[in-house]
Amino acid sequence: MAAADVRDMLDLPAEGQPRPHKKQKVVEKRPDTDVQASEGITRELYALLGERAPPIAINENRYKGRPKWMSKLRVRPWQMTPFTNNARSDGLVLRHWQRQSESAKAPALEGASEMEVDQAKAGGGAATPEKEYPFAKYNVKPRVPRRYTDEEYNRHLKSDDWSRQETDYLMDLVEEYDLRWVVIADRYDFQPQPIDAEANATALVPAKQYRTMEQMKARYYFIAASMLALEHPPSEMSEAEFDLHEKMMKFDPDRERARKELAALQLNRTADEVREEGILLEELKRITSNEQNFMTERRELYSRLEVPISVGNTTMYQSSQGLSQLLQTLLQADKSKKRRSILGPEAAAPSPAGQTPTSNAPTSARDSRADTPSHASAGPSSKKGSTAAAAKEPPQTVKTLTPAEEARYGVQHHDRLVPGVQFRSDRAQKLTQAKSNVQSQKLATALAELEIPPRLLMPTERVCKEFEKLIHSVNLLLDARKVSEKIESEIRVLEAAREERERKTKEVKDKGKPEVKSEEVENSDSGAGDSASAAPTADERADERADKGLQGAEDPDQSTGDRDGVSHKRSASVLSNGSDKSTKRQKK
Protein backbone atom coordinates (compact mmCIF):
# COMPACT_ATOMS: atom_id res chain seq x y z
CA MET A 1 0.00 0.00 0.00
CA ALA A 2 1.33 3.34 -0.96
CA ALA A 3 1.41 6.43 1.21
CA ALA A 4 -1.12 8.26 -0.97
CA ASP A 5 -3.76 5.56 -0.37
CA VAL A 6 -3.28 5.84 3.33
CA ARG A 7 -3.78 9.59 3.19
CA ASP A 8 -7.04 9.10 1.27
CA MET A 9 -8.38 6.68 3.80
CA LEU A 10 -7.57 9.03 6.66
CA ASP A 11 -8.79 12.18 4.87
CA LEU A 12 -5.38 13.76 5.05
CA PRO A 13 -4.17 16.32 2.62
CA ALA A 14 -2.05 15.00 -0.17
CA GLU A 15 1.05 17.16 0.49
CA GLY A 16 0.54 18.42 4.00
CA GLN A 17 4.04 18.14 5.37
CA PRO A 18 7.28 17.87 3.54
CA ARG A 19 8.81 14.47 3.25
CA PRO A 20 11.61 14.04 5.79
CA HIS A 21 15.09 13.81 4.40
CA LYS A 22 16.76 10.48 4.38
CA LYS A 23 19.41 10.21 7.07
CA GLN A 24 22.83 10.07 5.50
CA LYS A 25 25.51 7.80 6.81
CA VAL A 26 28.63 9.59 8.06
CA VAL A 27 31.79 7.64 7.29
CA GLU A 28 34.67 8.60 9.54
CA LYS A 29 38.01 8.75 7.86
CA ARG A 30 40.54 6.41 9.37
CA PRO A 31 43.85 7.84 10.39
CA ASP A 32 46.92 7.13 8.35
CA THR A 33 48.41 5.01 11.11
CA ASP A 34 45.54 2.52 10.83
CA VAL A 35 45.94 2.34 7.12
CA GLN A 36 49.65 1.82 7.43
CA ALA A 37 49.25 -0.74 10.19
CA SER A 38 46.53 -2.63 8.28
CA GLU A 39 48.70 -3.14 5.26
CA GLY A 40 49.40 -6.81 4.72
CA ILE A 41 46.48 -8.09 6.88
CA THR A 42 42.76 -8.29 6.30
CA ARG A 43 40.33 -5.70 7.59
CA GLU A 44 38.51 -8.16 9.85
CA LEU A 45 41.74 -9.34 11.48
CA TYR A 46 42.85 -5.77 12.03
CA ALA A 47 39.47 -4.90 13.60
CA LEU A 48 39.97 -7.62 16.20
CA LEU A 49 43.01 -5.75 17.53
CA GLY A 50 40.86 -2.96 18.86
CA GLU A 51 42.35 0.34 19.88
CA ARG A 52 45.69 -1.19 20.89
CA ALA A 53 48.33 -1.10 18.21
CA PRO A 54 50.39 -4.25 17.59
CA PRO A 55 53.72 -4.37 19.45
CA ILE A 56 55.59 -5.20 16.25
CA ALA A 57 54.85 -3.50 12.98
CA ILE A 58 53.69 -6.06 10.44
CA ASN A 59 55.13 -5.10 7.09
CA GLU A 60 55.35 -7.22 4.04
CA ASN A 61 58.89 -7.53 2.64
CA ARG A 62 58.90 -6.62 -0.97
CA TYR A 63 61.43 -5.43 -3.48
CA LYS A 64 62.04 -1.72 -3.55
CA GLY A 65 62.26 -0.79 -7.16
CA ARG A 66 64.02 2.05 -8.81
CA PRO A 67 62.52 5.47 -8.75
CA LYS A 68 60.48 6.27 -11.78
CA TRP A 69 62.70 9.12 -12.85
CA MET A 70 65.68 6.77 -13.20
CA SER A 71 63.88 4.64 -15.73
CA LYS A 72 63.65 7.64 -18.01
CA LEU A 73 67.46 8.12 -18.15
CA ARG A 74 69.56 6.74 -20.93
CA VAL A 75 72.14 4.01 -20.28
CA ARG A 76 75.61 5.52 -20.00
CA PRO A 77 78.31 3.85 -22.08
CA TRP A 78 81.48 2.21 -20.67
CA GLN A 79 84.68 1.54 -22.53
CA MET A 80 87.89 -0.46 -22.03
CA THR A 81 90.69 2.07 -21.54
CA PRO A 82 94.43 1.39 -21.15
CA PHE A 83 96.43 2.61 -18.16
CA THR A 84 99.96 2.46 -16.74
CA ASN A 85 100.93 2.15 -13.09
CA ASN A 86 103.55 4.62 -11.89
CA ALA A 87 104.83 2.09 -9.35
CA ARG A 88 106.13 -0.10 -12.16
CA SER A 89 109.31 0.72 -14.00
CA ASP A 90 108.79 -1.65 -16.96
CA GLY A 91 106.01 0.43 -18.55
CA LEU A 92 103.40 -2.35 -18.58
CA VAL A 93 100.11 -1.22 -20.12
CA LEU A 94 96.91 -2.75 -18.74
CA ARG A 95 93.22 -2.11 -19.49
CA HIS A 96 90.18 -1.63 -17.32
CA TRP A 97 86.55 -0.60 -17.77
CA GLN A 98 85.89 3.09 -17.32
CA ARG A 99 82.76 5.15 -17.83
CA GLN A 100 82.91 7.12 -21.04
CA SER A 101 82.58 10.83 -20.56
CA GLU A 102 80.60 13.12 -22.87
CA SER A 103 83.73 14.87 -24.06
CA ALA A 104 85.31 11.56 -25.03
CA LYS A 105 82.47 10.68 -27.36
CA ALA A 106 83.37 10.98 -31.01
CA PRO A 107 81.17 13.31 -33.02
CA ALA A 108 78.79 11.63 -35.44
CA LEU A 109 79.94 11.63 -39.06
CA GLU A 110 77.33 13.10 -41.32
CA GLY A 111 76.74 11.17 -44.47
CA ALA A 112 79.12 8.36 -43.51
CA SER A 113 78.37 4.73 -44.06
CA GLU A 114 78.19 2.06 -41.39
CA MET A 115 81.60 0.71 -42.40
CA GLU A 116 83.25 4.07 -41.83
CA VAL A 117 81.57 4.37 -38.45
CA ASP A 118 82.83 0.92 -37.39
CA GLN A 119 86.33 1.80 -38.56
CA ALA A 120 86.21 4.99 -36.53
CA LYS A 121 85.12 3.02 -33.49
CA ALA A 122 87.91 0.51 -33.97
CA GLY A 123 90.44 3.29 -34.41
CA GLY A 124 89.23 5.02 -31.27
CA GLY A 125 89.90 1.84 -29.28
CA ALA A 126 93.66 2.32 -29.59
CA ALA A 127 93.57 5.33 -27.34
CA THR A 128 96.55 6.62 -25.40
CA PRO A 129 96.92 5.49 -21.76
CA GLU A 130 95.72 7.69 -18.96
CA LYS A 131 98.04 10.39 -17.79
CA GLU A 132 97.73 9.48 -14.09
CA TYR A 133 96.48 6.30 -12.54
CA PRO A 134 93.77 7.12 -9.96
CA PHE A 135 95.20 4.70 -7.41
CA ALA A 136 98.75 6.02 -7.77
CA LYS A 137 98.23 8.27 -4.72
CA TYR A 138 98.28 5.18 -2.51
CA ASN A 139 101.73 4.21 -3.78
CA VAL A 140 103.70 5.89 -0.96
CA LYS A 141 107.44 5.34 -0.97
CA PRO A 142 109.38 5.73 2.30
CA ARG A 143 112.22 8.20 2.45
CA VAL A 144 115.53 6.36 2.35
CA PRO A 145 118.96 7.97 2.52
CA ARG A 146 120.92 8.47 -0.65
CA ARG A 147 123.55 5.96 -1.60
CA TYR A 148 127.00 6.56 -0.24
CA THR A 149 130.16 6.83 -2.27
CA ASP A 150 133.32 4.81 -1.73
CA GLU A 151 135.03 7.71 0.00
CA GLU A 152 132.08 8.32 2.36
CA TYR A 153 131.86 4.63 3.21
CA ASN A 154 135.57 4.31 3.98
CA ARG A 155 135.60 7.47 6.07
CA HIS A 156 132.31 7.33 8.00
CA LEU A 157 130.50 3.99 7.52
CA LYS A 158 133.21 1.35 7.67
CA SER A 159 132.58 -1.40 10.23
CA ASP A 160 134.44 -4.52 11.33
CA ASP A 161 131.22 -6.51 11.67
CA TRP A 162 129.67 -5.54 8.33
CA SER A 163 131.38 -5.77 4.96
CA ARG A 164 130.72 -3.43 2.04
CA GLN A 165 128.93 -6.13 0.02
CA GLU A 166 126.62 -7.04 2.92
CA THR A 167 125.85 -3.38 3.58
CA ASP A 168 124.90 -2.87 -0.07
CA TYR A 169 122.72 -5.99 0.08
CA LEU A 170 120.91 -4.64 3.15
CA MET A 171 120.27 -1.24 1.55
CA ASP A 172 118.89 -2.94 -1.59
CA LEU A 173 116.44 -4.96 0.50
CA VAL A 174 115.36 -1.84 2.39
CA GLU A 175 114.58 -0.02 -0.87
CA GLU A 176 112.83 -3.05 -2.36
CA TYR A 177 110.54 -3.85 0.57
CA ASP A 178 109.94 -0.25 1.75
CA LEU A 179 111.32 -0.60 5.30
CA ARG A 180 109.00 -3.50 6.17
CA TRP A 181 111.41 -5.09 8.60
CA VAL A 182 109.44 -8.30 9.08
CA VAL A 183 109.63 -8.99 5.33
CA ILE A 184 113.26 -7.87 5.16
CA ALA A 185 114.28 -10.22 7.98
CA ASP A 186 112.41 -13.06 6.28
CA ARG A 187 113.99 -12.45 2.85
CA TYR A 188 117.48 -11.72 4.15
CA ASP A 189 119.92 -14.31 2.79
CA PHE A 190 123.30 -12.80 2.06
CA GLN A 191 125.69 -15.08 0.22
CA PRO A 192 129.31 -13.89 0.25
CA GLN A 193 131.25 -14.03 -2.97
CA PRO A 194 132.76 -17.49 -3.54
CA ILE A 195 136.54 -17.71 -3.39
CA ASP A 196 138.42 -19.38 -6.24
CA ALA A 197 139.95 -22.48 -4.68
CA GLU A 198 142.59 -22.84 -7.39
CA ALA A 199 143.86 -19.27 -7.20
CA ASN A 200 143.59 -18.89 -3.40
CA ALA A 201 144.25 -22.31 -1.95
CA THR A 202 145.22 -20.95 1.48
CA ALA A 203 142.49 -18.31 1.75
CA LEU A 204 140.18 -18.34 4.78
CA VAL A 205 136.49 -18.82 4.02
CA PRO A 206 134.39 -16.57 6.27
CA ALA A 207 131.59 -18.29 8.15
CA LYS A 208 128.02 -17.40 7.27
CA GLN A 209 126.51 -14.97 9.74
CA TYR A 210 122.85 -15.02 10.66
CA ARG A 211 121.60 -11.48 11.22
CA THR A 212 118.75 -10.69 13.55
CA MET A 213 116.21 -7.97 12.89
CA GLU A 214 117.73 -5.79 15.62
CA GLN A 215 121.19 -6.01 14.03
CA MET A 216 119.77 -5.00 10.63
CA LYS A 217 117.92 -2.07 12.19
CA ALA A 218 121.00 -0.90 14.08
CA ARG A 219 123.14 -0.98 10.91
CA TYR A 220 120.55 0.81 8.78
CA TYR A 221 119.84 3.50 11.40
CA PHE A 222 123.56 4.17 11.81
CA ILE A 223 123.97 4.61 8.02
CA ALA A 224 120.86 6.82 7.77
CA ALA A 225 121.94 9.03 10.70
CA SER A 226 125.48 9.37 9.30
CA MET A 227 124.25 10.32 5.83
CA LEU A 228 121.79 12.81 7.33
CA ALA A 229 124.62 14.40 9.33
CA LEU A 230 126.76 14.61 6.18
CA GLU A 231 124.00 16.36 4.21
CA HIS A 232 122.93 18.67 7.05
CA PRO A 233 125.22 19.25 10.03
CA PRO A 234 123.45 19.10 13.42
CA SER A 235 123.72 22.87 13.78
CA GLU A 236 121.79 23.41 10.52
CA MET A 237 119.10 20.74 11.04
CA SER A 238 115.48 21.56 11.65
CA GLU A 239 113.74 20.39 14.80
CA ALA A 240 112.16 17.35 13.11
CA GLU A 241 115.44 16.33 11.46
CA PHE A 242 117.36 16.71 14.73
CA ASP A 243 114.83 14.55 16.62
CA LEU A 244 115.02 11.89 13.90
CA HIS A 245 118.82 11.98 14.01
CA GLU A 246 118.85 11.58 17.81
CA LYS A 247 116.41 8.64 17.70
CA MET A 248 118.44 6.80 15.07
CA MET A 249 121.75 7.37 16.86
CA LYS A 250 120.36 6.21 20.22
CA PHE A 251 118.82 2.97 18.93
CA ASP A 252 119.76 0.12 21.29
CA PRO A 253 119.37 -3.40 19.80
CA ASP A 254 119.68 -5.12 23.19
CA ARG A 255 116.87 -3.04 24.66
CA GLU A 256 114.70 -3.68 21.59
CA ARG A 257 115.29 -7.42 21.94
CA ALA A 258 114.41 -7.34 25.64
CA ARG A 259 111.26 -5.36 24.86
CA LYS A 260 110.12 -7.98 22.33
CA GLU A 261 110.84 -10.82 24.74
CA LEU A 262 108.81 -9.06 27.43
CA ALA A 263 105.95 -8.53 24.98
CA ALA A 264 106.08 -12.23 24.03
CA LEU A 265 105.90 -13.21 27.70
CA GLN A 266 102.90 -10.94 28.20
CA LEU A 267 101.12 -12.47 25.20
CA ASN A 268 101.87 -16.06 26.27
CA ARG A 269 100.50 -15.73 29.79
CA THR A 270 98.06 -18.30 31.07
CA ALA A 271 94.62 -17.51 32.43
CA ASP A 272 95.79 -18.08 36.02
CA GLU A 273 98.68 -15.65 35.60
CA VAL A 274 96.37 -13.01 34.14
CA ARG A 275 93.94 -13.49 37.03
CA GLU A 276 96.74 -13.26 39.60
CA GLU A 277 98.10 -10.12 37.99
CA GLY A 278 94.64 -8.57 38.07
CA ILE A 279 94.36 -9.34 41.79
CA LEU A 280 97.75 -7.76 42.44
CA LEU A 281 96.80 -4.66 40.47
CA GLU A 282 93.58 -4.32 42.46
CA GLU A 283 95.54 -4.64 45.70
CA LEU A 284 98.03 -2.03 44.52
CA LYS A 285 95.18 0.30 43.61
CA ARG A 286 93.65 -0.16 47.05
CA ILE A 287 96.96 0.51 48.80
CA THR A 288 97.56 3.61 46.69
CA SER A 289 94.09 4.96 47.44
CA ASN A 290 94.49 4.37 51.19
CA GLU A 291 98.06 5.67 51.33
CA GLN A 292 96.94 9.24 51.97
CA ASN A 293 94.79 8.11 54.90
CA PHE A 294 97.68 6.11 56.34
CA MET A 295 100.00 9.09 56.06
CA THR A 296 97.48 11.36 57.80
CA GLU A 297 96.98 8.91 60.67
CA ARG A 298 100.72 8.37 61.03
CA ARG A 299 101.36 12.13 61.12
CA GLU A 300 98.66 12.47 63.77
CA LEU A 301 100.28 9.74 65.85
CA TYR A 302 103.72 11.30 65.59
CA SER A 303 102.34 14.67 66.62
CA ARG A 304 100.92 13.07 69.77
CA LEU A 305 104.27 11.52 70.59
CA GLU A 306 106.04 14.86 70.53
CA VAL A 307 106.12 16.83 73.80
CA PRO A 308 104.03 20.00 73.53
CA ILE A 309 105.93 23.22 74.01
CA SER A 310 104.67 25.34 76.90
CA VAL A 311 103.57 28.78 75.78
CA GLY A 312 102.47 30.07 79.18
CA ASN A 313 104.26 32.71 81.20
CA THR A 314 106.25 31.19 84.10
CA THR A 315 107.55 34.41 85.66
CA MET A 316 104.82 34.40 88.31
CA TYR A 317 106.03 31.01 89.62
CA GLN A 318 109.66 32.07 90.05
CA SER A 319 109.06 33.58 93.51
CA SER A 320 108.27 31.70 96.74
CA GLN A 321 104.79 33.23 96.92
CA GLY A 322 103.98 32.04 93.39
CA LEU A 323 105.24 28.53 94.13
CA SER A 324 103.11 28.30 97.30
CA GLN A 325 100.07 29.52 95.35
CA LEU A 326 100.75 26.88 92.67
CA LEU A 327 101.00 24.18 95.35
CA GLN A 328 97.67 25.22 96.90
CA THR A 329 96.04 25.19 93.46
CA LEU A 330 97.30 21.67 92.73
CA LEU A 331 96.17 20.39 96.14
CA GLN A 332 92.72 21.90 95.67
CA ALA A 333 92.42 20.31 92.23
CA ASP A 334 93.47 16.93 93.66
CA LYS A 335 90.87 17.19 96.44
CA SER A 336 88.13 18.07 94.00
CA LYS A 337 89.02 15.03 91.86
CA LYS A 338 88.88 12.73 94.89
CA ARG A 339 85.56 14.20 96.07
CA ARG A 340 84.08 13.79 92.58
CA SER A 341 85.13 10.14 92.43
CA ILE A 342 83.66 9.44 95.89
CA LEU A 343 80.29 11.15 95.41
CA GLY A 344 79.68 9.51 92.04
CA PRO A 345 78.22 10.94 88.86
CA GLU A 346 75.43 12.80 90.69
CA ALA A 347 77.95 15.12 92.31
CA ALA A 348 79.46 15.94 88.94
CA ALA A 349 76.55 18.30 88.21
CA PRO A 350 77.24 21.82 89.48
CA SER A 351 75.23 22.74 92.55
CA PRO A 352 73.48 26.13 92.71
CA ALA A 353 75.29 28.98 94.40
CA GLY A 354 74.84 29.23 98.16
CA GLN A 355 73.64 25.63 98.53
CA THR A 356 75.24 23.82 101.49
CA PRO A 357 75.49 20.06 101.85
CA THR A 358 72.89 18.45 104.13
CA SER A 359 73.83 16.98 107.48
CA ASN A 360 72.83 13.43 106.61
CA ALA A 361 75.09 13.32 103.53
CA PRO A 362 78.20 11.18 103.97
CA THR A 363 81.42 13.10 104.42
CA SER A 364 83.89 10.36 103.70
CA ALA A 365 84.28 7.21 101.70
CA ARG A 366 83.77 5.06 104.80
CA ASP A 367 80.42 6.73 105.58
CA SER A 368 79.29 6.33 102.00
CA ARG A 369 80.14 2.62 102.06
CA ALA A 370 78.32 2.26 105.43
CA ASP A 371 75.21 3.90 104.02
CA THR A 372 75.10 1.68 100.98
CA PRO A 373 73.15 -1.26 102.57
CA SER A 374 70.46 1.05 103.95
CA HIS A 375 69.92 2.54 100.51
CA ALA A 376 69.87 -0.91 98.97
CA SER A 377 67.31 -2.18 101.52
CA ALA A 378 64.97 0.67 100.67
CA GLY A 379 63.81 -1.08 97.54
CA PRO A 380 63.53 -4.83 98.12
CA SER A 381 61.06 -5.24 95.29
CA SER A 382 63.55 -3.88 92.75
CA LYS A 383 66.21 -6.26 94.06
CA LYS A 384 63.88 -9.25 93.70
CA GLY A 385 63.00 -8.18 90.17
CA SER A 386 66.63 -7.90 89.18
CA THR A 387 67.37 -11.33 90.72
CA ALA A 388 64.53 -12.93 88.76
CA ALA A 389 65.70 -11.29 85.55
CA ALA A 390 69.23 -12.53 86.17
CA ALA A 391 67.93 -16.06 86.80
CA LYS A 392 66.03 -16.07 83.52
CA GLU A 393 69.12 -15.06 81.51
CA PRO A 394 71.20 -18.01 80.29
CA PRO A 395 74.70 -18.29 81.72
CA GLN A 396 77.31 -16.71 79.46
CA THR A 397 80.04 -19.09 78.30
CA VAL A 398 83.59 -17.77 78.08
CA LYS A 399 85.33 -18.83 74.89
CA THR A 400 88.99 -19.74 75.13
CA LEU A 401 91.01 -18.42 72.22
CA THR A 402 93.67 -20.49 70.55
CA PRO A 403 97.20 -19.05 70.08
CA ALA A 404 96.43 -18.46 66.40
CA GLU A 405 93.27 -16.53 67.27
CA GLU A 406 95.09 -14.54 69.93
CA ALA A 407 97.73 -13.58 67.38
CA ARG A 408 95.01 -12.70 64.88
CA TYR A 409 92.94 -10.50 67.20
CA GLY A 410 95.93 -9.04 69.06
CA VAL A 411 95.05 -10.50 72.48
CA GLN A 412 97.96 -10.28 74.92
CA HIS A 413 98.55 -11.30 78.54
CA HIS A 414 100.87 -8.88 80.31
CA ASP A 415 102.80 -9.93 83.40
CA ARG A 416 103.01 -6.38 84.68
CA LEU A 417 101.16 -3.35 83.38
CA VAL A 418 102.93 0.00 83.45
CA PRO A 419 100.63 2.88 84.41
CA GLY A 420 99.92 5.46 81.77
CA VAL A 421 99.67 5.35 78.00
CA GLN A 422 102.60 3.97 76.07
CA PHE A 423 103.30 3.49 72.40
CA ARG A 424 105.26 0.66 70.90
CA SER A 425 107.30 3.15 68.88
CA ASP A 426 108.45 4.80 72.15
CA ARG A 427 109.58 1.45 73.50
CA ALA A 428 111.48 0.72 70.29
CA GLN A 429 113.00 4.21 70.39
CA LYS A 430 114.23 3.74 73.96
CA LEU A 431 116.10 0.59 72.93
CA THR A 432 118.41 2.62 70.69
CA GLN A 433 119.27 5.09 73.48
CA ALA A 434 122.16 3.77 75.58
CA LYS A 435 123.61 5.19 78.80
CA SER A 436 126.45 6.94 76.99
CA ASN A 437 126.48 8.90 73.78
CA VAL A 438 129.34 6.77 72.42
CA GLN A 439 127.30 3.59 72.83
CA SER A 440 124.29 5.25 71.20
CA GLN A 441 126.42 6.31 68.25
CA LYS A 442 127.77 2.77 67.90
CA LEU A 443 124.21 1.41 67.91
CA ALA A 444 123.17 3.92 65.25
CA THR A 445 126.20 2.98 63.12
CA ALA A 446 125.39 -0.73 63.37
CA LEU A 447 121.76 -0.13 62.37
CA ALA A 448 122.90 2.02 59.45
CA GLU A 449 125.16 -0.81 58.24
CA LEU A 450 122.16 -3.18 58.38
CA GLU A 451 120.02 -0.56 56.52
CA ILE A 452 117.44 -0.46 59.33
CA PRO A 453 115.97 2.95 60.28
CA PRO A 454 116.31 3.92 63.96
CA ARG A 455 112.59 4.80 64.05
CA LEU A 456 110.39 1.96 62.81
CA LEU A 457 107.89 2.87 60.10
CA MET A 458 105.33 0.22 61.07
CA PRO A 459 105.95 -0.76 64.73
CA THR A 460 103.69 -3.78 65.07
CA GLU A 461 104.02 -6.25 67.94
CA ARG A 462 106.06 -8.75 65.92
CA VAL A 463 108.27 -6.02 64.46
CA CYS A 464 108.99 -4.61 67.94
CA LYS A 465 109.90 -8.07 69.27
CA GLU A 466 112.29 -8.73 66.40
CA PHE A 467 113.75 -5.23 66.77
CA GLU A 468 114.32 -5.85 70.50
CA LYS A 469 116.14 -9.12 69.68
CA LEU A 470 118.24 -7.31 67.11
CA ILE A 471 119.23 -4.54 69.55
CA HIS A 472 120.14 -7.18 72.16
CA SER A 473 122.35 -8.98 69.63
CA VAL A 474 123.99 -5.71 68.60
CA ASN A 475 124.72 -4.85 72.24
CA LEU A 476 126.31 -8.27 72.75
CA LEU A 477 128.40 -7.74 69.63
CA LEU A 478 129.55 -4.31 70.81
CA ASP A 479 130.47 -5.68 74.25
CA ALA A 480 132.43 -8.52 72.67
CA ARG A 481 134.20 -6.05 70.41
CA LYS A 482 135.05 -3.86 73.39
CA VAL A 483 136.52 -6.80 75.34
CA SER A 484 138.44 -7.93 72.26
CA GLU A 485 139.94 -4.48 71.78
CA LYS A 486 140.92 -4.33 75.45
CA ILE A 487 142.66 -7.72 75.27
CA GLU A 488 144.44 -6.73 72.07
CA SER A 489 145.72 -3.52 73.66
CA GLU A 490 147.02 -5.46 76.68
CA ILE A 491 148.74 -7.94 74.37
CA ARG A 492 150.42 -5.10 72.52
CA VAL A 493 151.63 -3.56 75.81
CA LEU A 494 153.05 -6.88 76.99
CA GLU A 495 154.74 -7.50 73.66
CA ALA A 496 156.33 -4.05 73.77
CA ALA A 497 157.58 -4.72 77.33
CA ARG A 498 159.02 -8.07 76.26
CA GLU A 499 160.81 -6.53 73.29
CA GLU A 500 162.23 -3.82 75.54
CA ARG A 501 163.42 -6.45 78.03
CA GLU A 502 165.07 -8.51 75.30
CA ARG A 503 166.78 -5.45 73.89
CA LYS A 504 168.22 -4.48 77.29
CA THR A 505 169.40 -8.04 77.91
CA LYS A 506 171.12 -8.10 74.55
CA GLU A 507 172.88 -4.80 75.29
CA VAL A 508 174.10 -6.14 78.66
CA LYS A 509 175.49 -9.25 77.00
CA ASP A 510 177.28 -7.19 74.35
CA LYS A 511 178.95 -4.99 77.03
CA GLY A 512 180.07 -7.95 79.21
CA LYS A 513 181.86 -9.98 76.50
CA PRO A 514 185.35 -8.20 76.42
CA GLU A 515 185.75 -8.31 80.23
CA VAL A 516 185.16 -12.04 80.32
CA LYS A 517 187.86 -12.60 77.67
CA SER A 518 190.53 -10.60 79.64
CA GLU A 519 189.85 -12.62 82.79
CA GLU A 520 190.28 -15.87 80.89
CA VAL A 521 193.71 -14.70 79.58
CA GLU A 522 194.96 -13.84 83.09
CA ASN A 523 193.78 -17.15 84.44
CA SER A 524 195.63 -19.01 81.69
CA ASP A 525 198.95 -17.26 82.66
CA SER A 526 198.69 -18.33 86.30
CA GLY A 527 199.42 -21.85 87.55
CA ALA A 528 197.20 -24.88 87.25
CA GLY A 529 196.39 -24.83 90.96
CA ASP A 530 195.54 -21.15 90.94
CA SER A 531 193.38 -21.56 87.88
CA ALA A 532 191.00 -23.89 89.69
CA SER A 533 190.57 -21.53 92.63
CA ALA A 534 190.82 -18.16 90.88
CA ALA A 535 188.77 -18.91 87.79
CA PRO A 536 185.21 -17.64 88.28
CA THR A 537 182.39 -20.02 87.77
CA ALA A 538 179.79 -19.55 85.09
CA ASP A 539 177.20 -18.53 87.65
CA GLU A 540 179.45 -15.87 89.11
CA ARG A 541 180.24 -14.50 85.65
CA ALA A 542 176.55 -14.30 84.90
CA ASP A 543 175.96 -12.51 88.20
CA GLU A 544 178.73 -10.06 87.45
CA ARG A 545 177.31 -9.35 84.01
CA ALA A 546 173.89 -8.83 85.57
CA ASP A 547 175.37 -6.41 88.12
CA LYS A 548 177.13 -4.51 85.41
CA GLY A 549 173.91 -4.41 83.39
CA LEU A 550 172.00 -3.09 86.38
CA GLN A 551 174.64 -0.44 86.99
CA GLY A 552 174.48 0.52 83.34
CA ALA A 553 170.67 0.66 83.49
CA GLU A 554 170.55 2.59 86.78
CA ASP A 555 173.50 4.93 86.06
CA PRO A 556 173.68 5.67 82.37
CA ASP A 557 177.00 6.05 80.67
CA GLN A 558 178.66 9.21 81.90
CA SER A 559 180.32 9.90 78.62
CA THR A 560 177.06 9.75 76.71
CA GLY A 561 175.33 11.67 79.47
CA ASP A 562 177.97 14.35 79.35
CA ARG A 563 177.83 14.53 75.60
CA ASP A 564 174.08 14.72 75.35
CA GLY A 565 173.47 16.65 78.51
CA VAL A 566 170.12 14.87 78.95
CA SER A 567 169.17 12.53 81.80
CA HIS A 568 167.58 9.31 80.52
CA LYS A 569 164.49 7.98 82.30
CA ARG A 570 164.34 4.38 83.43
CA SER A 571 161.47 2.24 82.11
CA ALA A 572 159.41 -0.09 84.26
CA SER A 573 160.66 -3.13 82.37
CA VAL A 574 164.30 -2.27 83.16
CA LEU A 575 163.57 -1.77 86.85
CA SER A 576 161.68 -5.05 87.06
CA ASN A 577 164.50 -6.83 85.23
CA GLY A 578 167.15 -5.40 87.55
CA SER A 579 165.20 -6.23 90.70
CA ASP A 580 164.72 -9.84 89.60
CA LYS A 581 168.45 -10.31 88.94
CA SER A 582 169.50 -8.73 92.24
CA THR A 583 167.23 -11.07 94.18
CA LYS A 584 168.69 -14.05 92.34
CA ARG A 585 172.22 -12.99 93.31
CA GLN A 586 171.29 -12.62 96.96
CA LYS A 587 169.80 -16.11 96.97
CA LYS A 588 172.94 -17.56 95.41
Curated annotation (Swiss-Prot):
Where along the chain is composition biased (Polar residues)?
353-365
Its primary localisation, in coarse terms, equals nucleus
Q: Which cysteines are joined by disulfide bonds?
A: none
Q: Write out the biased-composition intervals (Basic and acidic residues).
A: 1-10, 498-520, 538-548
Which residues belong to any copy of the SANT domain? 154-224
Keyword annotations from UniProtKB, A to Z: Activator, Chromatin regulator, DNA damage, DNA repair, Nucleus, Transcription, Transcription regulation
The UniProt annotation puts the region (Disordered) at: 1-40, 345-403, 498-588
InterPro entries in UniProt: DAMP1_SANT-like (IPR032563), SANT/Myb (IPR001005), Swc4/Dmap1 (IPR027109)
GO biological process: what's one of them? DNA repair
Q: Where is the composition biased (Low complexity)?
A: 373-392, 524-535
One of the record's GO cellular component terms: NuA4 histone acetyltransferase complex
Q: What Gene3D superfamilies does the record point to? A: Homeodomain-like
An annotated Gene Ontology molecular function = transcription corepressor activity
Localization of this protein = Nucleus
Highest taxon of the source? Eukaryota
The text of the family note is:
Belongs to the SWC4 family.
Q: Which PANTHER family match?
A: DNA METHYLTRANSFERASE 1-ASSOCIATED PROTEIN 1, DNA METHYLTRANSFERASE 1-ASSOCIATED PROTEIN 1 FAMILY MEMBER
Q: How does it assemble?
A: Component of the SWR1 chromatin-remodeling complex and of the NuA4 histone acetyltransferase complex.
Q: What does this protein do?
A: Component of the SWR1 complex which mediates the ATP-dependent exchange of histone H2A for the H2A variant HZT1 leading to transcriptional regulation of selected genes by chromatin remodeling. Component of the NuA4 histone acetyltransferase complex which is involved in transcriptional activation of selected genes principally by acetylation of nucleosomal histone H4 and H2A. The NuA4 complex is also involved in DNA repair.
- Listed name of the protein: SWR1-complex protein 4
> To which species is this protein native?
Aspergillus fumigatus (strain ATCC MYA-4609 / CBS 101355 / FGSC A1100 / Af293) (Neosartorya fumigata)
Q: Gene encoding this polypeptide?
A: swc4
